Every structure is written in C-alpha cells, then in structure tokens.
A protein has these predicted regions:
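Basic helix-extension-helix modules of the SAP/HeH family
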Residues: 2-115
Length: 115
C-alpha cells in the first residue's frame, strides 16, 4: 500500500489545477491516516499534525475519522502553494516510513542468516 501512496504523490506533483490537486490530496491523506502500517496508533497522528503545521486538539487523536475531517478541512481552505508544501511533507513521511520498513527487513534477514 505504501508504494501505491508514494506513486500517487509523485503523480500529483505534476497537477496544476487546484481543484484536481485538492481531490488527489484528499485521497492521499485519507490513505495515509487509515493505513495502520504508517501510523499504528491514533496518538501517533499527532506527529503528522505537527509536520503539516495543523493545530491538534487532544480530541482529534481519539478517532481517525475526526483526524481526517480536520485534515480535509485544512486542505479545502489551502492555496495551491500551501498544497504543494503539504504534498512535499507527505512525500517525506512516506519515504521515512518505507525506509523504516527496509531497516526492519534487513534486520530480520540478518538474524535469519546468523541462524
């Protein structure tokens, strides 16, 4: 799933129409928030709020649905330039998450080879 989200981010970078860009951002953010491989616990979503410079009240972290509503309302109000900045942040989030997966896989392979 992470590879698909990353590919969608890369495709979205070339979109110039703000309405189309927003629709793609809705899709990307929803996929990231609901993917438990990226953020296993709701509390971890606070990190995403901070990276995107979105104010985060504690009640938002109790439910992924509430978090999504906040993210989507911010996207809806954003300018094209703000959306581009947010997309770059999401790209970094995905790269970090995929790199973490690679570290885990490498560690597991090393352990297996020692046995």
């Amino acid at each position: 799933m992470k590879n698909k989200i990353y590919k969608k981010i890369m495709i979205t970078q070339g979109i110039k129409d703000i309405d189309q860009f927003k629709m793609e951002m809705y899709s990307i953010l929803t996929s990231i928030v609901y993917d438990r491989e990226i953020y296993k616990h709701n509390k971890e979503l606070e990190e995403l709020f901070l990276k995107l410079n979105i104010p985060c009240k504690p009640y938002l972290l109790k439910s992924r649905n509430q978090s999504i509503i906040k993210f989507l309302s911010v996207i809806h109000k954003s300018t094209y330039e703000e959306l581009v900045e947010q997309l770059q942040i999401l790209k970094k989030v995905m790269i970090e998450s995929m790199e973490e997966d690679n570290k885990v896989e490498t560690t597991e392979k090393t352990k297996e080879s020692r046995l």
